[in-house]
Regions:
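Beta-propeller-forming repeat regions
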Residues: 1-179
């Protein structure tokens, strides 16, 4: 912002954990206007480990078998929230692997808002590592909850189901189509 790096966290949150800032006894109004360079002593910044993310989209990493990976960005429809559960299986029994995904995270602090725009996604594979998103009405997979995990299970007759583990709620069960 304005050519400077500003803290993302609120003053109370940082001063409760970083003694250097607590000792400065900065007013909240002053804290809001100061850059990272103005808040922290030079020696603290010089000893800071800086990490940088270069990909912010949801992706899959495809291993070529020799430890080399190709990154494929998933379709725009799955980019609206986090993905916490994913299963790779042949949903439509065409011989190609498909992806079933769900997610959301309601545990963020209020200033960041919650990630709640993932309603579950089915991506049909084309056999060439391309995936096409399916409408909810076509896939039958629609789940607005905070899904923490997806698992494929079978009943005694061999019918396949996807069970979604939902935070603070009962699991949901989805039967896969037979073809």
């Amino acid at each position: 912002y304005n050519g400077g790096d500003y803290p993302l966290h609120q003053k109370k949150e940082l001063t409760s954990q970083i003694l250097v800032l607590k000792k400065k006894n900065i007013k909240a109004s002053d804290y809001a206007k100061r850059t990272i360079d103005e808040l922290f002593p030079k020696n603290v910044l010089e000893n800071t480990i800086l990490k940088q993310a270069s990909i912010s989209e949801s992706v899959i990493a495809i291993n070529d078998g020799n430890g080399n990976y190709t990154i494929k960005i998933l379709p725009p429809q799955v980019q609206f929230s986090c993905i916490c559960g994913i299963q790779c299986l042949d949903v439509n029994k065409d011989g190609n692997l498909d992806l079933v995904m769900a997610g959301n995270n309601f545990e963020f602090k209020p200033q960041y808002s919650r990630l709640d725009a993932n309603y579950g996604n089915v991506l049909l594979g084309d056999g060439k590592l391309g995936f096409k998103w399916q409408n909810y009405s076509d896939s039958g997979f629609f789940i607005r909850n905070e899904v923490k995990h997806l698992e494929v299970i079978k009943d005694k007759k061999g019918n396949e189901f996807i069970i979604a583990a939902i935070n603070n709620d009962t699991p949901k069960l989805y039967r896969l189509n037979e073809k």
